[in-house]
């Protein structure tokens, strides 16, 4: 990236870019849905491919001059299919939400009944929230987790499925720290004649590395983002069985999108190539190791976690016994250069703008090179900030010392 070219044309935006780079370098990033892309992925996003309109699909475009962007999209599709063992892939979704929209449009009619995970229990806006298109176009019925364990209540899922006879069951979450049993979801779907869709946006990297069960053999359709644990550009993708390929492709284009972002698709292809490597698998193992180390260290310091730990890259702090809200802790940690997000916990007595929880994740800190012993240090800082707001200056010092060991993009700007 040549900041000087940007600065000559638009010094204000150049300044914003530099400030954001500085923020990323000088804060511990614990937002579970964020990560730092490789330089190769970053560079692929800023190429002449951004100039090309390419409505349609490779070999079936509505514009001329697409022979080379066709090659980029074919590489992305083939690599994605190989990565997850899928029959068909669509790499055009601009986001995970648009991937989900296309999947719904392909499988459902307005008003159809769908079973999805409650947002307050770890689901996602696009899994039936009333403020989202999904909850407005379709009749969503929500399932959740058991209050005593924090694990998905599969008995409840089956009971609701038998009662409501949904056309589609959606599995997947944005704040669920445990392994999801896709085989069990498939069995429930088959009992009521429903399609099964899995949104694996958060866990795609773990699935690719074999650290979480792969939903592809069980689901009719699988959607994902390409960032988060997959560590690619911001965007989405859809995998499906061949029998749904035509409907999925048509639902995305011309159904819900026009021209694809070919520079982003090229960056997705780079990301998928990286994800097929042995190095990526080792990286995913370190994400989980770090998450378990952070979770255990927090619990050792008296911090409760929803479900009592984690199997993946994230955890949910239950702050109900601490006297501090999720909103307050998010602010406190940001003041000492630790970035996280307040998050509702299951059966939360507080509203979504305050919350009784905070969500933490380890993909970004693992990308920086941090290790389990660093997670213990971070847990200790967080525990002290929960208990004592006056610990701020000491916490800042400890954060700065930790970040010094792991520079971010040292050769950039």
UniProtKB/Swiss-Prot annotation:
It catalyses: (6R)-5,10-methylene-5,6,7,8-tetrahydrofolate + glycine + H2O = (6S)-5,6,7,8-tetrahydrofolate + L-serine. One of its GO terms (cellular component) is cytosol. Belongs to the SHMT family. Homodimer. It is found in: Cytoplasm. It is an enzyme of class 2 (transferase). Its EC number is 2.1.2.1. This is Serine hydroxymethyltransferase.
């Amino acid at each position: 990236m040549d900041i000087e070219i940007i600065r000559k044309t638009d010094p204000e935006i150049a300044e914003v870019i530099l400030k954001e780079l500085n923020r990323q370098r000088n804060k511990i990033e614990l937002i579970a849905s964020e990560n730092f892309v490789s330089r190769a992925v970053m560079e692929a996003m800023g190429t002449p491919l951004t100039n090309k309109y390419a409505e349609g699909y490779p070999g079936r475009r509505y514009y001329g001059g697409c022979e080379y962007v066709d090659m980029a999209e074919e590489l992305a599709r083939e690599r994605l299919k190989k990565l997850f063992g899928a029959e068909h892939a669509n790499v055009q979704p601009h986001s995970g939400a648009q991937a989900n929209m296309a999947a719904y449009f392909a499988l459902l009619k307005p008003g159809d009944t769908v079973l999805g995970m409650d947002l307050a229990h770890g689901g996602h806006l696009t899994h039936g929230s009333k403020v989202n298109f999904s909850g407005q176009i379709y009749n969503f019925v929500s399932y959740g987790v058991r209050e005593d364990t924090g694990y998905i209540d599969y008995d409840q899922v089956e009971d609701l499925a038998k009662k409501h006879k949904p056309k589609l069951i959606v599995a997947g979450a944005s704040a669920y720290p445990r392994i999801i049993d896709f085989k069990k979801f498939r069995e429930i779907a088959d009992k009521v004649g429903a399609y099964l869709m899995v949104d694996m946006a958060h866990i795609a990297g773990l699935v690719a590395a074999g650290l979480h069960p792969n939903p592809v053999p069980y689901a009719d359709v699988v959607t994902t983002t390409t960032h988060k644990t997959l560590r690619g550009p911001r965007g989405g993708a859809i995998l499906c069985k061949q029998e749904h390929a035509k409907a999925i492709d048509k639902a995305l284009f011309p159904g819900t999108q026009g021209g694809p972002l070919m520079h982003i698709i090229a960056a997705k292809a780079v990301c998928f190539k990286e994800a097929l490597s042995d190095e990526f698998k080792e990286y995913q193992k370190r994400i989980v190791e770090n998450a378990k180390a952070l979770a255990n260290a927090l619990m050792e310091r008296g911090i409760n976690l929803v479900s009592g730990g984690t199997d993946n890259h994230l955890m949910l702090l239950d702050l109900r016994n601490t006297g501090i809200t999720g909103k307050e802790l998010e602010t406190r940690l940001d003041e000492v250069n630790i970035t996280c997000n307040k998050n509702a916990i299951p059966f939360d007595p507080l509203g979504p703008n305050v919350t009784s929880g905070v969500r933490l994740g380890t993909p970004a800190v693992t990308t920086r090179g941090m290790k389990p012993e660093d997670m213990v240090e971070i847990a200790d800082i967080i525990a002290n900030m929960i208990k004592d707001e006056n610990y701020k200056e000491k916490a800042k010092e400890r954060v700065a010392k930790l970040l010094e060991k792991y520079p971010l993009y040292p050769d950039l700007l």
